[in-house]
């Protein structure tokens, strides 16, 4: 096993945190990129055994030292939520990739989103879906291109499905973030893919452990496929306080679902995410079912 560290971006967030935990549990050295080493989340990473390195994806110079000597990079970028229409996500990917290539890093695992391979022009119709959903998907596609064309010896792209964790408060999916009202305008009875965030860590670990096998793999990553109605039924069977589903899209909007989120949800119904559990299983990656996740989430309440 290599003693060179893996540089993990987004380490204090959901995905990066899951990756850091999976690597540490497997005995892989983790270099966690954080903007504020004094934060509580950073402290928990350090206590778990990660080495904290200060850096900011918006500051290319700050990435040089963290990338130096790393065996691989876990790449996960987001938009700037204070300026959703800017190109921060793509630029952050470019900054990280440039620093990693300059440092001689040979492997990258990049996390995108299920469905980012859809090139149907209708999927980017701003008049139909709004400016932000179209921009969001273009950014995901462009960030993937940046990774693929950077010249790493080996690269892997993960396209996770919707997070199971989105159905646990606080979450944007709930009216007011913390209520028990699920603010969705989607079709409640159509099966959709789900992933437990911990499985992103599992998949990343698998790719890092076998770079050649996973080189060029674009994995649509899911642990289960079931409808929103069925997901809520499972959760309500283990929760002390039930989640309330809207009786119709109009009710969800009355609960205060942001228009941009409603547009994104409608797009999801028209262009459903293609990830399915068997895609990960075919590569030997074990995943978490929704029921398994729900019971674990209930225990942590």
Could you say what each language-model-derived stretch is?
Residues 89-93:
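Aromatic "clamp/platform" in nucleotide-sugar-dependent glycosyltransferases that forms part
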Residues 46-59:
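Rossmann-fold cofactor-recognition segment
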Residues 10, 53, 190, 221, ...:
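Short, flexible active-site loop motifs that bind/organize anionic cofactors or intermediates
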Residues 2-43, 58-61, 68-72, 78-88, ...:
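Oxidoreductase cofactor-interface core, primarily capturing Rossmann-like NAD(P)-dependent enzymes
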Residues 22, 214, 238-239, 248-301:
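A hydrophobic C-terminal alpha-helical subdomain
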Residues 53, 244-248:
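General small-molecule cofactor/ligand-binding pocket signal
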Residues 49-52, 81, 192, 300-301:
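Acidic/glycine-enriched edge-of-secondary-structure segments
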